[in-house]
Amino acid sequence: MTEYKLVVVGAGGVGKSALTIQLIQNHFVDEYDPTIEDSYRKQVVIDGETCLLDILDTAGQEEYSAMRDQYMRTGEGFLCVFAINNSKSFADINLYREQIKRVKDSDDVPMVLVGNKCDLPTRTVDTKQAHELAKSYGIPFIETSAKTRQGVEDAFYTLVREIRQYRMKKLNSSEDGTQGCMGLPCVVM
């Protein structure tokens, strides 16, 4: 069984825990209890492959930002979550993305942009804005509602597919001999 280490990041109160709990336990948590760090595991079948999802639900609060580097190092893919009714959380996505790229020392890290709370009538982040941001990053964008479960599986499963593509790309580049053990071309003298 293939294991995938997924990390859910985003500002405080955007619904990271609600999304994760909706996926894992099939219910909506409506009271807000700020997370420090929670880990969940779930076995699912995605595209015919049995997968073990190891999901790290992270703190959005700024006072826990020092912990971010550690979980970013171990994560293979990232759900970058903002709330469609919170423009600041949308603006913060770039900070999370830059930190992930810095910690992973790579511009090519599997990510999915997630606009949560799409069940709410008031929207301050336009869908078009979010699509444009995702396109500029070269990553998928999915709108979700942890409350109605809309898009929840799609978001996590899309991230697994992104990780699969990334793994295949890495495998193919190492098999064709263009990459050495240090990720550099090999030269024989």
UniProtKB/Swiss-Prot annotation:
GO MF assignments: G protein activity; GDP binding; GTP binding; GTPase activity; protein-containing complex binding
Record lipid sites (S-palmitoyl cysteine): C181
Post-translational modification as stated in the protein's UniProt record: Palmitoylated by the ZDHHC9-GOLGA7 complex. Depalmitoylated by ABHD17A, ABHD17B and ABHD17C. A continuous cycle of de- and re-palmitoylation regulates rapid exchange between plasma membrane and Golgi.
SUPFAM superfamilies: P-loop containing nucleoside triphosphate hydrolases (SSF52540)
Localization annotation: Cell membrane; Golgi apparatus membrane
Subunit record text: Interacts (active GTP-bound form preferentially) with RGS14. Interacts (active GTP-bound form) with RASSF7. Interacts (active GTP-bound form) with both SHOC2 and PP1c (all isoforms) to form a tertiary complex; SHOC2 and PP1c preferably bind M-Ras/MRAS, but they also bind K-Ras/KRAS, N-Ras/NRAS and H-Ras/HRAS.
Covalent cross-link Glycyl lysine isopeptide (Lys-Gly) (interchain with G-Cter in ubiquitin) as placed by the record, residue numbers: K170
Source domain of life: Eukaryota
Name of the featured protein: GTPase NRas
Enzyme nomenclature, EC number: 3.6.5.2
Similarity remark: Belongs to the small GTPase superfamily. Ras family.
Activity regulation, short description: Alternates between an inactive form bound to GDP and an active form bound to GTP. Activated by a guanine nucleotide-exchange factor (GEF) and inactivated by a GTPase-activating protein (GAP).
Organism from which the protein derives: Rattus norvegicus
GO BP terms, alphabetized: defense response to protozoan; myoblast differentiation; negative regulation of skeletal muscle tissue development; positive regulation of angiogenesis; positive regulation of endothelial cell proliferation; positive regulation of fibroblast proliferation; positive regulation of type II interferon production; Ras protein signal transduction
Any Pfam family the entry gives: Ras
Cited SMART domains: RAB, RAS, RHO
Alphabetical list of CDD domains matching this protein: H_N_K_Ras_like
Residues with PTM Phosphoserine: S89
Residues given in the record as GTP binding sites: 10-18, 29-30, 57-61, 116-119
Propeptide section residues: 187-189
Membrane topology label: Lipid-anchor
Entry keyword annotation includes Nucleotide-binding: yes
Lipidation (S-farnesyl cysteine): C186
Reactions catalysed: GTP + H2O = GDP + phosphate + H(+)
Keyword Lipoprotein in record: yes
Main subcellular location of this protein, as a coarse class: membrane
